[in-house]
Amino acid sequence: MIGAFKRNRGSSQSFAKECQPSTLKANLEVAKELPFSDRRDFEDATQGYIGSLSDEQIIGPDGGVVWCMKSYGFLEPETPANTVNPSLWRQAQLNAIHGLFKITDNVYQVRGLDISNMTIIEGNTSLIIIDTLFTTETAQESLKLYYRHRPQKPVRTVIYTHSHSDHYGGVKGIVKEADVKSGEVQIIAPVGFMESVVAENILAGNAMHRRSQYQFGMLLSPSVKGHVDCGIGKAASHGTVTLIAPTIIIEEPVEERTIDGVDFVFQLAPGSEAPSEMLIYMPQQRVLNMAEDVTHHMHNLYALRGVEVRDGNQWAKYIDAARVAFGSKTDVLIAQHHWPTTGQMRINELLKKQRDMYKFIHDQTLRLLNQGYTSRDIAETLRMPSSLEQEWSTRGYYGTLSHNVKAVYQKYLGWYDANPANLNPLPPVAYAKKAVEYMGGADAVLARAYKDFQKGEFRWVASVVNQLVFADPNNHQARELCADALEQLGYQAEASTWRNAYLVGAMELRQGVPKRRSTGKRNNIAVLNNEMFFDFLAVRLNATKAEGKIIVSNWCFINSNERFVITLENCALTYIQGWQTDADATITLKRTTFEALLANEITMVDFLRSKEVEIEGNRLRIEELLKLFDDFDQSFPVVEPMGGST
């Protein structure tokens, strides 16, 4: 899942500093250790190229830039910049290759026009689209690019491989919702798709969107000192994210369907890269689509934006099941990120090494935690076997061995390391103030931290000086030194996600947090069923404001004729289907009107005055209830305490 935030271009590079000698040394060592002479990935990434956008950018209806690849022209030199890890530089170059590509007869991909790929299959009379990119603008332009080179068959089928927004967000750019409702267009998705969308993008959506700014570097300008890549793709487009609910659900572990003359075998892979995911084999074309379960890097078992931990053991089994079932019958392996792999020997080798990578991380973490090591101990000491470490396809550009180890630990043992000293620590600000006091005060800490910074001990400096920031966010020397340390860590990071997080943290320490209020997610809210809708509403209930209140109301939605009893009691909002005769009030409304209120498109006054809203009984109780819900702030602080600096 990726949040749709516009990059604040030009704001980060002007404050950025040069790399320190120790950073330069570390990056030069990387250049010596890895097989940079192996150019097969570049050959694969350019094979089948047909054409691309002439000006390398996509402009939205408001005139804003939605996507711009030419901003990454600085990646053209073979020699990496000193401020970028050479391994990440190579991945960034590969992800900069963009356009329409032929995979095999009747199968095409648009790559590099968003963070994900669009796969286009030509049926007898129509097109079948696998994944619709992140935004409507990039999806629309990708389809236009295809039509410039291929027959203009209509899109009649959309397939979502999984429940992350960069794979469904552009759907309204290529099909109309009315055509889906009429049955003219079908949308196919794996079982649990909508539930996963709600859980990841709605219930915890605001926090994930904010954290996504760090993971994907959405506030950074493209430059050698700023944004260079996202590992899984170049960058997330910043346009319009939409969603149309699927009309057909794949429910069986392996399910075969024929769509407009094209045979498909769907293999469910729940709990792998997403809670709801499936792999796709096309026997006529001998193409295996591994969705996002096999890509050209180490993926996340835990995403830094926040997500349910993924099961590395099960993930490995899904990969092997696909290898056994389809490996000997596949000539081209594709995914919904990155470039294809051709030839059975190479395909099977890729599948085996990806399988073994996730299996190794899972099993070795469990071996060591069973010996009593903590997650941080294991992450610090475990190393990949040399047979995998020298493979480009297992390098950590998105996930890392370090945070994937911690994910496995969390999955089995949770956050607590069993040391009672860590059972109930002080909260961050109180801890920071006490720690600074014990260390002799801010000046003493800064004096030692400056010396350690010169030695290249950036991890320690960032950690200890961030305590100064939390103890006193107005300590500008501490903010600057912490930013400097984070920046050097970013310059050294092989993982795009780590680089982005470090550099966004440095930027916000220097410039503050860009302020923006949530405008809601109308498109996502609109596709929720009523139960999901009330779950989302309950998450926004402010318990402090609700203290001591008991409100019972009937809700009747005109569009669906469904009725619910909503109860506020004990600072919890619950619901059941039905009707309560002695409720405080009854509200009859079109759900779209309430969606507009939750998305901040209309005010409370407008809502209550709307002709589409009727209230019987105690109107004041409905007003009282609606005032209890929070409007989430998309700009909450991350590298400084809540409240921030003044």
UniProtKB/Swiss-Prot annotation:
The modification N-acetylmethionine is found at residue 1. GO terms for molecular function: linear primary-alkylsulfatase activity; metal ion binding; protein dimerization activity. Binds 2 Zn(2+) ions per subunit. Its EC number is 3.1.6.-. GO terms for biological process: dodecyl sulfate metabolic process. Induction: Expression is increased in sulfur-limited chemostat cultures. Pfam families: Alkyl_sulf_C, Alkyl_sulf_dimr, Lactamase_B. CDD domains: arylsulfatase_Sdsa1-like_MBL-fold. InterPro entries: Alkyl/aryl-sulf_dimr_sf, Alkyl_sulf_C, Alkyl_sulf_dimr, Bact_Alkyl/Aryl-Sulfatase, Bds1/SdsA1_MBL-fold, Metallo-B-lactamas, RibonucZ/Hydroxyglut_hydro, SCP2_sterol-bd_dom_sf. Keywords: Acetylation, Hydrolase, Metal-binding, Zinc. Zn(2+) 2 binds at residues 166-167, 292, 337. Its cofactor is Zn(2+). It is an enzyme of class 3 (hydrolase). Zn(2+) 1 binds at residues 162, 164, 273, 292. The presence of this bacterial-like protein in S.cerevisiae results probably from a recent horizontal gene transfer event. Alkyl/aryl-sulfatase. Enables the use of SDS and 4-nitrocatechol as sulfur source. PANTHER family: ALKYL/ARYL-SULFATASE, ALKYL_ARYL-SULFATASE BDS1. Belongs to the metallo-beta-lactamase superfamily. Type III sulfatase family. This is Alkyl/aryl-sulfatase BDS1. It comes from Saccharomyces cerevisiae (strain ATCC 204508 / S288c) (Baker's yeast). The lineage of its organism: Eukaryota, Fungi, Dikarya, Ascomycota, Saccharomycotina. The gene is BDS1.
